[in-house]
C-alpha cells in the first residue's frame, strides 16, 4: 500500500508524534508533571501518574510538544474527561495552521471546576480517563486515551 492509498487522516497520523507533555501550575509556572512519551498512539490505553496536588490548583497550563511531517490547515483537539466512562467535562481547543516537517509546542490553560463540583482523589484515582481526539479541520488524525492515577 503506497502513501497515495492512505486516507488524509492516516497520512497525517503516520507522521504525527507527541514528543512530550508538561503540566504546570498556571499561577506559578512551576512544572508539576512531565512525561517524554508519545501519547498519540490510538490502540493502547496510556497511563499517567500525576501529583495529587494538581486537584487543588486553580488552573493548569498544559504544553504539548509534537512533530508532524504533513502540514495541517486547522489543527485542533476535542478533549473529554470521563469518570467511570461517563463524560464529566469536555473542552475544545484550536491551534490553527501547522507547517509540514515541524516541531511545535502548544500551550493551553485549563481552569479547575468549582470546588463544590470536585470529587476526592481517592474516588477519582484510576477511574478518570482523558480521551483526546486530534483533528485537522474535520479529519480525525488519532484518538488517545489516558487513565489518570494520583500520587
Swiss-Prot record:
Pfam families: GMP_PDE_delta (PF05351). Interacts with Pde6. The gene is PrBP. Signal peptide: none annotated. Belongs to the PDE6D/unc-119 family. This is Probable cGMP 3',5'-cyclic phosphodiesterase subunit delta. SUPFAM superfamilies: E set domains (SSF81296). GO terms for cellular component: cytoplasm; nucleus. PANTHER family: RETINAL ROD RHODOPSIN-SENSITIVE CGMP 3',5'-CYCLIC PHOSPHODIESTERASE DELTA-SUBUNIT, RETINAL ROD RHODOPSIN-SENSITIVE CGMP 3',5'-CYCLIC PHOSPHODIESTERASE SUBUNIT DELTA. InterPro entries: Ig_E-set (IPR014756), PDED_dom (IPR008015), PDED_dom_sf (IPR037036), Rhodop-sen_GMP-Pdiesterase_dsu (IPR017287). It comes from Drosophila willistoni (Fruit fly). GO terms for biological process: sensory perception of light stimulus.
Amino acid at each position: 500500500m503506497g502513501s497515495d492509498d492512505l486516507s488524509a487522516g492516516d497520512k497525517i497520523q503516520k507522521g504525527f508524534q507527541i514528543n512530550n507533555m508538561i503540566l504546570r501550575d498556571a499561577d506559578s509556572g512551576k512544572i508539576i508533571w512531565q512525561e517524554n512519551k508519545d501519547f498519540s498512539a490510538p490502540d493502547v490505553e496510556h497511563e499517567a501518574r500525576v501529583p495529587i496536588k494538581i486537584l487543588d490548583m486553580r488552573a493548569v497550563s498544559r504544553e504539548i510538544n509534537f512533530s508532524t511531517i504533513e502540514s495541517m490547515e486547522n489543527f485542533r483537539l476535542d478533549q473529554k474527561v470521563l469518570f467511570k466512562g461517563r463524560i464529566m467535562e469536555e473542552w475544545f481547543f484550536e491551534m490553527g495552521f501547522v507547517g509540514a516537517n515541524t516541531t511545535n509546542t502548544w500551550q493551553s490553560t485549563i481552569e479547575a471546576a468549582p470546588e463544590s463540583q470536585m470529587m476526592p482523589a481517592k474516588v477519582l484515582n484510576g477511574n478518570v480517563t482523558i480521551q483526546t481526539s486530534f483533528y485537522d479541520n474535520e479529519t480525525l488524525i488519532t484518538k488517545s486515551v489516558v487513565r489518570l492515577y494520583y500520587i
